[in-house]
Amino acid sequence: LDRLFRNLLTDSAGNMHLAEISIDKLWNFDSPSGLQGLIELRAFETMPDVADQSLAALFVRAVVSMLAQEPITGDLVRHGARLHDRYMLPAGLWEDLGEICHDLRAVGLPFEREWLRSIFEIRFPVLGRLSLPRGEVVVRQALEPWPLMAEMNGGGSTSRMVDNSTDRLEIALPDANVLGDGQVVVHGVGLRFREMGGQLVAGVRYKAAAGWPALHPHVPIQSPLRIEVLDAQERLVARARYFYWNPEGPRYEGAPRTLDEAKARRKARWRPDAASGEPPRRPVPASHCEESYYTLDLRRQPGAE
């Protein structure tokens, strides 16, 4: 198994030990500690309390037990670009969790998706809401993979940096009738919503900071992100700004000391604005990108304001 998977189960730099599924301690004769029969799952973040941490462990044990009873023998699904599109969005992952829990129940393991709700809310918090007469528009944090940059020489050593200048949000309509004939516009570009898990969802990827090195150093910072709701006559009915970082200055004074302080910082980065008295505006239609079916990438939108 070690010889079969060692060149496949690595991180993006080829490191076996830092892979999300690490087998360098399973049956590795090249290391004095490599014959322990261990498989490490390294992609789990530490939960804030014992209950959620135990729940994550229970979920993993349930999946392992299911696979022991019913090994998967079919062909693997080639997800392609969907891994960095659909499955970066909370709605896509929540729907996928539902399918896994359905498979668990099918083999006699009664694991309910709602048990994972608290972990889901920790990982994908609601950043803000826009209230409308028919309901609300919900904005959540989404996942954003940060690419590894080329080698950089400095001080006699070579290192590779990560481009952390981009961020991704999910904008969801829990009720398909919330907008009526209106639309949601981000930085002047109209969003295209897709049905997912019983709601309409769109991802938004944007340049959040001026990091270096970066894949797109020429793209200006697109924070604060301006989110607007227009009616059928393209009149502004609701809007808010979301700041990626401290809206009052260049940086925060250290990490938050308490959970309440962290929540207060997040709340302050969502700024609803008055929407009355604005003249009609015409949003720019989003340009098509095959690898971003669910996500609007503002870096690639020439008409973005």
Segments predicted by a language model, with ranges:
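C-terminal accessory/tail domains of diverse enzymes
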Residues: L1-E305
